[in-house]
């Protein structure tokens, strides 16, 4: 007789590019989100929780022109109805695209301007790498329906407050601001957007090479090239603005093929940051010359700087920096990026700046996809996981998660008494649990408490019960004594105390307070 086939067991493993989070990681993220939400709420923003699933049509971004729209997103097609094919659905890849759909769908019921914040996981169907996962948290705040740059200034100020609220000290970060309109002015100057170059006197000597218009494809190459400034550096960008560059493997990446004069103008824009915001603005005005859109962008930066200064957000926290180019192909006006300025050791032991932890800007075209009308909007997205990594790197987060007080079980028949103890502790706001494993071996109960990183264990056997007392073991002090104390010190610093049963809560609270754990 043939043996029945065994049912194959599934592999217990996470999918590639995903990970699980435990204990302290979850608690620390929740606390950080709560602190950021507190700042958003203080600024008058309302919470929004939208669906994690959107139609592919509503998302609209990262989607290739192919039958299955799954590049960049996790997408699937619903079953077809009798009269039409099933809709394509996808997990959201950010929190901004859902906001555009929500505003377009509910705009008649929402205040104008609409100020909202949202927090939650997003999913990207991209190649994972070290520290780069396919699911991660975003924490956004946006104002929809306000065209004034006062909304952009407010977002920048709020971003500063958020960073300080989670433990990033002033001096350890800087919020850098640029404006897509200024870049448009630069492109206009070099013949990308206008029929004739409009140069300031400083650039008149370049005029003979600036007259021809560039194609839209070439403009796209220019935008993608300057977006790589952080990765390639100035010389790498200069090469890609010209004929191209070879990477370390020798492969050639074709460039925008600009003339030297055109490249010089673009590089002057990227290098226009002066010693003060005022100097930077002067440099930018000279570069954009008589370009209307360029001048408008510089004026907006100047106004933002004035508004921030009025609120005591000076250049020690927020600076105008034309080298902020990330996302300029997406945004339509001011852009901003929060960068941590302190140094850390990377995985290979090399010293480097931590880098960007938040970014945002003005995107006046996003809602237009749904309504056909331009709706001004501006906002910021904070990378919560990167912020947590930064605080870990600075040693400002305790990597251990303090466990609950453990009430041990010395007598199975008296479980009700132990439950009464733990109930009293919980009612006093103290995290506590009864040991629910096999109580036969008391040593295993203490090992369990150690595994849980418990600060205190409560012990009450038959003798203690008759006397009306409990034994309270300070596990933190006990561990310290076990590491270094002599016998005499151990006698002088006992880590276990006998107290009347009625004083259980008071004694536990006293021990927690001694270790800075009482809240």
From Swiss-Prot:
It is found in: Cytoplasm. Belongs to the class-II aminoacyl-tRNA synthetase family. HAMAP family: His_tRNA_synth (MF_00127). The keyword Cytoplasm applies. GO terms for biological process: histidyl-tRNA aminoacylation. One of its GO terms (molecular function) is histidine-tRNA ligase activity. Keywords: Aminoacyl-tRNA synthetase, ATP-binding, Cytoplasm, Ligase, Nucleotide-binding, Protein biosynthesis. Homodimer. It catalyses: tRNA(His) + L-histidine + ATP = L-histidyl-tRNA(His) + AMP + diphosphate + H(+). Its EC number is 6.1.1.21. It comes from Roseobacter denitrificans (strain ATCC 33942 / OCh 114). The keyword ATP-binding applies. The lineage of its organism: Bacteria, Pseudomonadati, Pseudomonadota, Alphaproteobacteria, Rhodobacterales. The gene is hisS. GO terms for cellular component: cytoplasm. This is Histidine--tRNA ligase. It comes from the Bacteria.
